[in-house]
């Protein structure tokens, strides 16, 4: 991913969110992860599906430009660029099974060269 090679600032991930989504819940608006000034240092987003959700129960992660829906499967790790190239949303969950995910971001740590870290 080009965003990793544009400069020599190291990346870190220090925020992890564990989420439980019930039927009808979730974040259904199309969005991308570095779209606000506060989040401008996000380079990559990551998510781990913590349980399986049957396809007929919805709850997948939709990626707009890729025309792709990823259905939750326990243990699956998803990693994507935080930029506008990967607009996404949480699909509507319709069944009785709640969806569990862990999610976070790789953040650029400006001001410290990656060479200093190595």
What are the roles of these predicted feature ranges?
Residues 1-77, 85-118:
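Fe(II)/2-oxoglutarate oxygenase catalytic core
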């Amino acid at each position: 991913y080009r965003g990793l090679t544009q400069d020599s600032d190291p990346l870190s991930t220090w925020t992890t969110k564990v989420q439980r989504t019930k039927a009808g819940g979730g974040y259904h608006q199309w969005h991308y992860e570095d779209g606000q000034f506060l989040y401008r240092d996000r380079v990559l987003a990551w998510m781990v599906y913590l349980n399986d959700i049957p396809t007929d129960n919805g709850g997948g992660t939709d990626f707009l430009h890729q025309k792709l829906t990823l259905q939750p499967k326990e243990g699956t790790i998803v990693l994507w660029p935080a930029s506008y190239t990967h607009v996404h949303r949480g699909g509507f969950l319709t069944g009785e099974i709640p969806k569990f995910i862990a999610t976070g971001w790789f953040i650029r740590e400006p001001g410290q060269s990656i060479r200093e870290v190595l």
